[in-house]
From Swiss-Prot:
Belongs to the glycerate kinase type-1 family. The keyword ATP-binding applies. Keywords: ATP-binding, Kinase, Nucleotide-binding, Transferase. It comes from the Bacteria. One of its GO terms (molecular function) is ATP binding. This is Glycerate kinase. Gene3D superfamilies: Glycerate kinase, domain 1, Glycerate kinase, domain 2. It is an enzyme of class 2 (transferase). The keyword Nucleotide-binding applies. Pfam families: Gly_kinase. Disulfide bonds: none annotated. It comes from Bacillus subtilis (strain 168). The gene is glxK. NCBIfam families: glycerate kinase (TIGR00045). GO terms for biological process: organic acid phosphorylation.
Length: 382
């Protein structure tokens, strides 16, 4: 019996690999001779680097870069086991969690550190880049990233404009002749699960600006500035992606990656499953087990369990979902490939207890699931 174990992380308690290991222990206590394949995965958000490194026996590389407020921060990226695919979470360099609440101001926060991480990945020999762009603190349209990679964004005096979305109003010309030439030979895939355009009422600023510290007065300024950046890019490069779905992701970083780096924007879970070669592994599987911290009505919108389940169903492989908590409105997942759901929490326990004993609860739940399968095989002579 071949069993694939492909969970996402359980936030604040288990990494995807730790969750997979606990599930394996539980199943092995009932089916010790089964063929187990652990594939810790993610949906392109937090934990994607760790999951892909763990799944491919890769490594984490630390790098000091420019933080959102211009200060040095210790960030990281992953190099997958093939030695040529780098995985970057832009939040590691330019994330909202790096900015104290009282200092959040997208007029001044920058994506420069994200560009520096990309440069470091190229220095490490990357030929393919996977970039997750969730959790940003920025609304600069990716200007800082472009500057870090050698592009020049100039004001009327020929000087580089400053950091942040506020400085974009000073932009008078764009020079990409110095953009890192290695980028021309790199395949760049961006994990993007939002469909917002760059500007307008559904754009980067209007939808995501407030959570990054933008006041009502800032919103119009930022939207106008990012729109100006797009106008200038269209004049300089002859192309525009401002209305492309996902252009507004990460304060316009999605647009910049499309416009300047010719990136492909895809659903995060699709990129991750392709990176771990999930399709070839699942074809002859007997069972797939997936899961994440919470399964609810939002799980069907591009989350890991549904991505895994849909891939498995292409080959008629049954799928079991395991979660820390399961909401009352989670039934939609049954129409998207998951056959059964189980919660690991043994009754009404304090949240702290659930986090602290998550591995124990996971292993026990997995053992009980395996025992139920064995019992069914015995009773119904399957």
């Amino acid at each position: 019996m071949k069993i694939i174990i492909a969970p996402d992380s359980f936030k604040e308690s288990l990494s995807a690999l730790e969750a997979a290991e606990a599930i394996e222990r539980g199943f092995k206590s009932v089916f010790p001779g089964a063929d187990y394949r652990k594939l810790p995965v993610a949906d392109g958000g937090e934990g994607t680097v760790q999951s892909l490194v763990d799944a491919t026996n890769g490594r984490i590389i630390e790098q000091v870069v420019t933080g959102p407020l211009g200060e040095p921060v210790r960030a990281f990226f992953g190099m997958m086991g093939d030695g040529r695919t780098a995985v970057i979470e832009m939040a590691a360099a330019s994330g909202l969690h790096l900015v104290p609440v009282d200092k959040r101001n997208p007029l001044i926060t920058t994506t420069r550190g994200t560009g520096e991480l990309i440069g470091a990945a190229l220095d490490a020999g990357a030929e393919r880049l996977i970039i997750g762009i969730g959790g940003s603190a920025t609304n600069d349209g990716g200007a800082g990233m472009i500057q870090a990679l050698g592009g020049r964004l100039l004001d009327n005096s020929g000087s580089e404009i400053g950091p942040g979305g506020g400085a974009l109003s000073q932009l008078a010309s764009i020079d990409v002749s110095g953009l890192d030439s290695r980028l021309r030979n790199v395949k760049l895939e961006v994990a993007c699960d939002v469909d917002n355009p760059l500007t307008g009422p559904k754009g980067a600023t209007a939808v995501f600006g407030p959570q990054k510290g933008a006041t009502a007065d800032m919103l119009d300024v930022l939207d106008q500035n990012v729109s100006h950046f797009a106008d200038m890019a269209e004049k300089a490069l002859g192309s525009t992606f401002r209305d492309t779905e996902g252009a507004g992701a990460a304060g316009g970083l999605g647009w910049s990656l499309l416009t300047y780096l010719q990136a492909d924007l895809k659903r995060g879970i699709d990129i991750v499953l392709e990176a771990v070669d999930f399709e070839s592994i699942v074809q002859d599987a007997d069972l797939v087990i997936t899961g994440e911290g919470r399964i609810d009505s939002q799980t069907v919108h591009g989350k890991t369990p549904i991505g895994v389940a849909k891939a498995a169903k292409s080959y008629d492989v049954p799928v079991i979902g395991i979660a820390g908590s399961i909401s009352r409105d989670s039934n939609a997942v049954y129409q998207h490939g998951i056959d059964a759901l189980f919660s690991i929490v043994p009754g009404a326990v304090p949240l702290e207890d659930a986090f602290e004993h998550a591995a124990e609860y996971m292993e026990r739940t997995a053992r009980d699931i395996a025992a139920s399968i064995k019992l069914a095989k015995t009773m119904f002579l399957i």
